[in-house]
Amino acid sequence: MSFTVIIPARFASSRLPGKPLADIAGKPMIQHVFEKALQSGANRVIIATDNENVADVAKNFGAEVCMTSVNHNSGTERLAEVVEKLAIPDNEIIVNIQGDEPLIPPVIVRQVADNLAKFNVNMASLAVKIHDAEELFNPNAVKVLTDKDGYVLYFSRSVIPYDRDQFMNLQDVQKVQLADAYLRHIGIYAYRAGFIKQYVQWAPTQLENLEKLEQLRVLYNGERIHVELAKEVPAVGVDTAEDLEKVRAILAAN
């Protein structure tokens, strides 16, 4: 099975400007992500960026680069531009890895592509079990609820499903007994290239605007998303300077 990885790499970031080029163990962060993608067995890895400095650095370490507009509102819009510019066939499997995931396990990059290929869906993703009550109640940890076959019912920053008996009069989060039903969504996606072009034709929805989760546009428009449990739990991504130091420490220890 062949698949293409596209890595969106925005230079402008409100919390950590210039993070694709942040040094981690002697390499820019985007190079770590690129190398992990190559290790997944992808037949093609493309860095999509709106910044010439990122493009120059990426070309220097041997990456294929596609320059994109600075005006995109989401990573999926950036992917759609790449698909159009490079005339990627509609049936090609595209895996979207964020440019701030330098520790992403290559095995789950391939897993999400395999997941899409196995099921009759246009979009697939991964999740991990939630074992910590604080994570369950953290709105930055996106929860996903699926049916018995792994097809997504809903994504939310709220707790889903809501355990009425435990949570109605909850005083201490630490006393929560977690059920197996709680899953945290991992922000890695696989799609058919043609579906990416379809996605950007749909108008943003009230659901996605409320939750700030663009994948809800897919469910709203009647398409199915399949989610599997990730074979390996990914380490921290880089959103802040504190995250960057954590990743540096992890790589230094190894």
UniProtKB/Swiss-Prot annotation:
Primary localization: cytoplasm
Biological processes per GO annotation: CMP-keto-3-deoxy-D-manno-octulosonic acid biosynthetic process; lipopolysaccharide biosynthetic process
InterPro entries membership: Cytidylyl_trans, KdsB, Nucleotide-diphossugar_trans
Gene3D superfamilies per the UniProt record, alphabetical: Spore Coat Polysaccharide Biosynthesis Protein SpsA, Chain A (3.90.550.10)
GO MF, one annotated term: 3-deoxy-manno-octulosonate cytidylyltransferase activity
Pfam families linked to this entry: CTP_transf_3
Keyword ATP-binding: no
EC number(s) per entry: 2.7.7.38
CDD domains hit by this protein: CMP-KDO-Synthetase
Keyword annotations: Cytoplasm, Lipopolysaccharide biosynthesis, Nucleotidyltransferase, Transferase
Function: Activates KDO (a required 8-carbon sugar) for incorporation into bacterial lipopolysaccharide in Gram-negative bacteria.
Similarity comment: Belongs to the KdsB family.
Name listed for the protein in its UniProt record: 3-deoxy-manno-octulosonate cytidylyltransferase
Organism: Haemophilus influenzae (strain 86-028NP)
Gene of this entry: kdsB
